[in-house]
Amino acid sequence: MRIDLNCDLGEAFGNYSFGGDNQIIPLITSANIACGFHAGDENVMYDTIKLVKDNGVGIGAHPGLPDLKGFGRRNMDITPKEIYNLVVYQLGALDGFCKVHQTRINHVKPHGALYNMGAKDKNIAHAIAQAVYDFDSSLILVGLSNTLLITEAESLGLRTASEVFADRRYEDNGQLVSRKEADAVITNTEEALDQVLKMVIENKVVSKNGKEIDLKADTICVHGDGAHALEFVSQIREKLTKEGIDIQSL
């Protein structure tokens, strides 16, 4: 049994810095690097790719909606064509810096609102998947387990990775509880660790209402920001290793 640990990185821009990328990178196996629309800029992309490559971590593009002020977490009234083009644009930007560092993109994971819109809207899911396929059909598309983004990508012949979340609660339909709700994020470490093991070993998760949901877990999203982020990720790694689960990149 194996699992990937992924984290969203490179989300600083200009004079603004977020999270502790230097500390979290050695603990993960895949990095989702912001491409300049919701966060990140040309200097941050350059530095982050170098850091990720030097640590032997898989490089992923993390395209988002063009919304710096909202950190890409606000829905936008945007057409599938616009979605397609903004994904291609951001992949091209990150790919350029990968070429400079003599490495390549391994996977793509949409960010924030784009991720959630793709999970629920078939047309948007198809636009994201088509953009990835047309850019490089060998890339892996990461999406929320059991959602439209995964099925649309697979219908095109793309490889996919079904993602689960260590510290997020789930609705009865398998969607993530909105961050607007007070209980969306699991703050108790033991509860989060128990959820991780259930998802990875049993392929199940218990919703906020107590319903047991089947899911597939190829990769676990962990977060590098917050006061106890590093300790939390270390505990996840330790728990998985004790259960005999290999932690490997996609």
From Swiss-Prot:
NCBIfam families registered for this protein in UniProt: PRK05406.1-2, PRK05406.1-3, PRK05406.1-5
Gene Ontology annotations of biological process type: carbohydrate metabolic process
Ranges in a coiled coil: none
One annotated GO molecular function: ATP binding
UniProt family annotation: Belongs to the LamB/PxpA family.
Function: Catalyzes the cleavage of 5-oxoproline to form L-glutamate coupled to the hydrolysis of ATP to ADP and inorganic phosphate.
UniProt-recorded name of the protein: 5-oxoprolinase subunit A
Entries under CDD domains matching the protein: LamB_YcsF_like (cd10787)
SUPFAM superfamilies: Glycoside hydrolase/deacetylase (SSF88713)
EC numbers for this chain: 3.5.2.9
Catalytic activity, as annotated: 5-oxo-L-proline + ATP + 2 H2O = L-glutamate + ADP + phosphate + H(+)
Subunit-structure text: Forms a complex composed of PxpA, PxpB and PxpC.
Keyword Ion transport (UniProt): no
UniProt keyword list: ATP-binding, Hydrolase, Nucleotide-binding
Domain of life of the source: Bacteria
Keyword flag Calcium: no
